[in-house]
């Protein structure tokens, strides 16, 4: 079973050569890390297990996303990347994983880690196996070319989209991921929370709203983040995935480090209506 790209040619370049150039542009951008990460091939214990990455078009959020990938790549190739994204389309189940096969992008195909996936399904009791949720969803797809650029096809993924973004669902998923990571100590597993921040307010208002959410992220306060999103009109689309990583970070004794916050007005255009982007890592 192969999942074909839905947003190649719109969110990112569809030509492989141009796509690689676009990814390197993201790293060298003045909003980005301004450098290409050097990949280590020495196998050692990974410090940064969990990340927040944005998922807009690369011309808007690529330079911010590059900050998270800089740290991920610098610590070497993971065996498995669990990618949690919000469900923008409203299709499919409340929490759904692509069941098997591979995902294709212009840079090639990446296989699903079916063994880890089925362990998660068994542990969580809330994950459905459902392709419909993923067919047109961009939040996971846009992460793959960044990973493929450095690791080719030498890693596997577990793609999960979350429509019901509640603290209770986040707790179920975090417990399941924690248990699976504990049961597979020889597998190098990282978890990406794919999310943009506040949407379509002027730059100054977006920054103010985002700062309130970022404070909760720094405190690993997942319930506080939920309250900010729900109570203060912060239109943060992937708060469910972020809540999962906040819970996991606390379970693993990690701290939150904000790598970069910017808006689409900073990266590529007008500031009268912008989207906020955040890169964060959770490590020692």
Swiss-Prot record:
This is MEMO1 family protein YG5714_2180. InterPro entries: MEMO1_fam. It comes from the Archaea. Belongs to the MEMO1 family.
């Amino acid at each position: 079973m192969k999942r074909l790209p839905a947003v190649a040619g719109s969110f990112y370049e569809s030509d492989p050569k141009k796509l690689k150039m676009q990814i390197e542009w993201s790293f060298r951008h003045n909003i980005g890390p301004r450098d290409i990460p050097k990949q280590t091939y020495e196998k050692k214990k990974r410090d940064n297990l969990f990340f927040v990455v944005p998922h807009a078009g690369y011309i808007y959020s690529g330079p911010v996303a590059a900050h998270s990938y800089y740290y991920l790549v610098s610590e070497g190739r993971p065996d498995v990347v669990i990618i949690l994204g919000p469900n923008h389309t409203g299709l499919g189940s409340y929490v759904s994983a692509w069941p098997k096969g591979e995902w294709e992008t212009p840079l090639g195909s990446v296989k699903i880690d079916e063994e880890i996936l089925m362990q998660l399904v068994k542990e969580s009791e809330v994950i459905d196996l459902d392709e419909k949720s993923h067919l047109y969803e961009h939040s996971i797809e846009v992460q793959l070319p960044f990973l493929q650029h450095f690791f080719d096809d030498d890693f596997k993924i577990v793609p999960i989209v979350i429509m019901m973004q509640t603290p209770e669902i986040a707790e179920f998923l975090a417990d399941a991921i924690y248990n699976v990571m504990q049961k597979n100590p020889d597998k190098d597993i990282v978890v990406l929370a794919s999310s943009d921040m506040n949407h379509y307010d002027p730059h100054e208002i977006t920054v103010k709203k985002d700062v309130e959410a970022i404070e909760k992220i720094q405190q690993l306060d997942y319930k506080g983040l939920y309250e900010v999103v729900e109570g203060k009109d912060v239109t943060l689309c992937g708060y469910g995935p972020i809540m999962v990583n906040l819970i996991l970070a606390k379970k693993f004794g990690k701290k939150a480090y904000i790598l970069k916050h910017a808006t689409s007005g900073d990266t590529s255009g007008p500031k009268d209506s912008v989207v906020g982007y955040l890169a964060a890592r959770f490590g020692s």
